Amino acid sequence: MNDNWYKKIIGARTIKTGLATFLTALFCLALNLNPIFAILTAIVTIEPTAKASLKKGYRRLPATIIGALFAVIFTFIFGDQSPFAYALSATFTIILCTKLNLHVGTTVATLTAMAMIPGIHEAYFFNFFSRLLTAIIGLVTAGLVNFIILPPKYYDQVESSINLTESKMYELFELRMRQLLLGKFTKGAPYRQLNQLIDLNQKVETLLSYQKDELSYHKHHDSEWIQLKALTTRAHTNRLFITHLSNLVYLPKDTIITFTNDEKLAILSIAQSINNIYSTGHFERKKQHASLLKMSVKGLDEFDSNQLKSHVIYEILLIYRILDHRFA
C-alpha cells in the first residue's frame, strides 16, 4: 500500500500550517495572550522550504513591529473609533515596509495593525509589547514546525513534471516541423502550446531550487545530491531545447521558405525520431539526414533571401545536437 496516500487528500504544507496554528494558539493561551496576531504570523510563515521560512521570517518580524507601532501611535492620536487611525496606520506601515525592503512582511504587518486598533484602548505599551511577543511566538513556532515536520521532498513531483515537459516538447517539435513543411510559417503557429511548455519548465526549475534549499538545511544522503544533479541537468537541457524551439515557432510575418524534397524528408525523419524519444526511451540518430541538412545550410548565403531558411535549419541541427549529447 502506498505510504503517501494522504498526499492525495491533504498536502504536507497544509498539515504543517494546521499544526503551527494549533501550537501557536496553545502557547499564547497558556501565557494568557491574544493568539490572533501570533496565528496570523504563523500562517504566512509556512513556506515551501525551511530556508524560505527563516529568510522571510527575518523580514516579517521587523515589519510586524512597524505595524504594531503605527497602530499604537495613531490610536493614541485619533482614538480607536476614528477612520483616520485605520487609514494612516495602514498607509504608513506599507510606506515604511516598502522603504526598508520588507515587502514579504507588509501584508501581515498591515493586518496586525488593523486587528490591534480596536483592542488597544489606553494600554498602549502593554499592547505593543504583547503584540511583539505574540509575533515572535508565531514566527518561531511556524519556523520550527516547517523545519522539523515533514521536510518536503520534491523529487517525484519534479520527475513527473520533467517527463510531462519532455513529452509535450517532443510532440510540439514534430508538430511545428510538419507546419513548416506545409508552409504554415506564422498562421496557426502553436504559441499557446509553447507558452504552456515554458511555464511548465519554469515550474520544474522552481521546484528544483526548493529541493536544493532543503538539502542545504537537512541531513541527507549523497545519493540525493546525485539525484538532484541528474534532474537539474535534464531541466537545463529541456530549457535549451525549448529556447531553440521558440526560435522555430516565432518567425517573422510573411515568412516564406522553400525546402527541397530531400530536405523535407530529412526534417520529417528527424522530427519523428525526436517525437519517439518519450515512448522508446532513446534517441534514434538520423546521421544521414542530419548530414544532408548540414550540407544544405553550407550552400546557403545567410545574407540573401535564404537567410530565414538557413536560420530554421540551424535551429533544427542545434536541437538535434542537444539530444545527441544528452543520449550519448
UniProtKB/Swiss-Prot annotation:
Any one of the GO CC terms: plasma membrane
Topological relation to the membrane, as annotated: Multi-pass membrane protein
Keyword Membrane among UniProt keywords: yes
Key words of the record: Cell membrane, Membrane, Transmembrane, Transmembrane helix
Main location: membrane
Keyword Transmembrane helix: yes
PANTHER family assigned to the protein according to its UniProt record, in alphabetical order: MULTIDRUG RESISTANCE PROTEIN MDTO (PTHR30509:SF9), P-HYDROXYBENZOIC ACID EFFLUX PUMP SUBUNIT-RELATED (PTHR30509)
Family statement: Belongs to the UPF0421 family.
Protein name: UPF0421 protein SSP0904
Gene source species: Staphylococcus saprophyticus subsp. saprophyticus (strain ATCC 15305 / DSM 20229 / NCIMB 8711 / NCTC 7292 / S-41)
